[in-house]
Amino acid sequence: MSGFTGAGYPKAIPPALARHIEQSNQEGGQFRIGVWTGASTAPELDGVLAQAHGIQMRLPYQSDPSCRQLINAGQMLYTDMHLSHVAQFAWFGFLGKLDVAVVEVVGVLPDGRLIPSTSVGN
């Protein structure tokens, strides 16, 4: 997901995704995702997904108490790397396959180009 501080991360997708994860888990499934961001986000992303037990792996930086608790309990994988290394690691495939990217934008131009918010940080 895009994210570089609390100002620039998707606002609507994480809570909706957390609800979907909780429902899946209640039905016996185990739906979890990897969360890669440019930096820290906010409780409305990390917190809601962690509380839903929906994050399998988090990188490169997080500051959420719910995430920290799961990381320290060994229930969430965490890779603590310098922010500047994430893009290169992703490009070279060291982090595995990226299936979906969620990026916060403030607008879409008529030709389809996106206008990113402050979410573009790395």
Regions found by a protein language model. Name each.
Residues 2-122:
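Conserved alpha/beta enzyme-core scaffold
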